[in-house]
Amino acid sequence: MSRCKAVIIKMLTAFTAIVWLAGCSSISPYSTVTKLDLKLTASDQLNPDLNGRPSPIVVRLIELKHPVAFENADFFSLYEHAKESLSPDLVASEELELRPGETVDFKLSVESGSRYVGVLAAYRDLRETQWRYVVQVTPADLTVAELILDQTGVHNKNEKLAKADD
């Protein structure tokens, strides 16, 4: 009986060690996973309607190998036919709705091969807004980006602050 207990204890110890090591590797600063911490902040004046009232907006996060097709395509090609418009650069995409005054934090593990995340925002007035933005991610590292969506479009918070200082 004690021999059986010893085998069970050894197996449990080995299993615990494997689980513990797997957990440590997932939070390791030496991880090879490409990560993006993305904060999207919607202003209180987001996406005004015809009467100037703020409105929710649909936002798509699009993982890309290269940004050129995303940067050159028109809004409707990207919104309605992303797979065809961005092939072969499209890796993955995700969609969400952002309400005026809302802040959303994402902690994304970017797919292997993705080097950029395109942000596509479905503004009511496409001609007068910056409806796309590209975030370059560093392979096998953590990239942090904070974007603001307001009545004029999508902007990097740090770039907007730098322009205000000029």
What is the meaning of each model-derived region?
Residues 2-13:
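Bacterial N-terminal signal peptides that target proteins for export
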Residues 20-23:
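C-terminal motif of bacterial Sec signal peptides marking the signal peptidase cleavage site
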Residues 25-28:
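Bacterial signal peptide processing site
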Residues 39-50:
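Short amphipathic, basic-aromatic surface patches that mediate peripheral association
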Residues 43-45, 136-166:
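Extracellular beta-sheet/turn segments enriched in Thr/Pro/Gly and aliphatic residues
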Residues 51-60:
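Short coil-to-beta strand junction motifs in C2/discoidin
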Residues 73-110:
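Tryptophan-paired
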Residues 114-124:
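A short, solvent-exposed beta-strand micro-motif common in secreted/extracellular proteins
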